[in-house]
């Protein structure tokens, strides 16, 4: 069984890489407004917004990190970025979904998501 897994990993081009959990450097990034999203990013969000998701997309020298929290029963949610940093060999992204304040409660469902833009990098991305 173990040999089958190794063969499948080899055939599919996948690799396993150890990721160091030591923070090294902050990364410059921009939080985009919806009007600034590339068309493909908007399409990816629309296709995935009903469930929680984490996606990356690369276009024209930029890397887009997309985090969605799926359908929420009400509106008024916000997302706080806790950390965007470069670890030894990975980009680490940590966000927090913040519930609505009493005065912001709405009866309609919402689909909170966040799009971060940065210069393209080769490192894998870890969402937390």
Where are these regions (language model features)?
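Exposed, flexible binding/inhibitory loops of compact, secreted disulfide-stabilized domains
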Residues: 13-128
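Sec-dependent bacterial lipoprotein signal peptides
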Residues: 1-12
